[in-house]
Amino acid sequence: MSRNFSMRAKVYLKPLVFFQIIDAYDRRPKGDNQVMGTLLGRNKEGHIEITNCFTVPHKEHSENKRIDLDMAYASEVLELNMFAYPNERVLGWFCTGKSVSRSASLIHDYYVRECCEGQPLHLLVDAALKNQRLSTRLYCAVEMGVPGGTKGLMFSLVPLEISNENSDLVALRCIEKQSQQQASKQMERFVPELAQVVDATRDMQHRLDLVLRYINDVLARKKKPDNVVGRSLYAALTAVPLLDSDKFRVMFNTNLRDMLMAITLSTMIKTQLEISEKLSCMQDQ
């Protein structure tokens, strides 16, 4: 094993990587049983964080179970990614499936040359969603064999932890809520992004009502004050800048206009791509 990697290192995975892999698996070409690609992220003194990924086209040979990667494509996409996210580095590769493939050793050799910060990691994702669960395992290759003889690689499991920030949790809760219940007819009239803002505002209003009710009960001596709750409320209040209602209204409306403009532009681009795709299909026919 590389001296730069420790089995005790903490590896964290961003939820965005899951969505990118699942999306690539759903959009895979006909005839392909799996998708694979490059894992990107940061490695700081044993704290490894997988934050991004991109797929790499490959060709499967059924006669010998060999897989050939399009290395030229991988190098070009990696170079473009470095312009957008200069802090991200290659950490390894991912693959969909139930078990480590026979070509994992050859793919490992390629990513050994690409990884500048330690041993490449191998993320295996079972995108078939067996039992409605996304099975995920992380491996690291370990050299094994007789000294002076033939050596091989054994892929050993590495502990993996899902890293969720506050912004990630908001999106995940929204996805979970939409997956568990159908949108009502009243909410269908809203733009989806605005409906999420309305739900978040209602939830915040409910939480504020609970806090105000607790404070009023403490002031009226109906409840015994709790120092832990008081310190938490103080930290929450001091974390928010003090703004009057007029400034807050202007700031909120400005951000809302920016969001509506982004929604409009993204809708126009989506429509243009759909029209372009239909025109290209008509020309092929």
UniProtKB/Swiss-Prot annotation:
Q: Which GO terms describe its biological process?
A: formation of cytoplasmic translation initiation complex; translational initiation
Please tell me one Gene Ontology term that the record gives under cellular component.
Answer: eukaryotic 48S preinitiation complex
**What domain of life is recorded for the organism?**
Eukaryota
This protein's gene is called eIF3f2
- Sequence ranges assigned to domain MPN in this UniProt record: 11-145
Family per record: Belongs to the eIF-3 subunit F family.
Official protein name in the record = Eukaryotic translation initiation factor 3 subunit F-2
Pfam families with a match to the protein in the record: JAB (PF01398), MitMem_reg (PF13012)
What InterPro entries does the annotation carry? eIF3f, EIF3F/CSN6-like_C, JAMM/MPN+_dom, MPN
Keyword set for this entry?
Answer: Cytoplasm, Initiation factor, Protein biosynthesis
Give the quaternary structure. Answer: Component of the eukaryotic translation initiation factor 3 (eIF-3) complex. The eIF-3 complex interacts with pix.
Q: Where in the cell is it found?
A: Cytoplasm
User: Function, please?
Assistant: Component of the eukaryotic translation initiation factor 3 (eIF-3) complex, which is involved in protein synthesis of a specialized repertoire of mRNAs and, together with other initiation factors, stimulates binding of mRNA and methionyl-tRNAi to the 40S ribosome. The eIF-3 complex specifically targets and initiates translation of a subset of mRNAs involved in cell proliferation.
Q: What is its main location?
A: cytoplasm
Organism, per UniProt?
A: Drosophila melanogaster (Fruit fly)
GO MF entries: metal-dependent deubiquitinase activity; translation initiation factor activity; translation initiation factor binding
Under CDD domains, the record lists: MPN_eIF3f (cd08064)
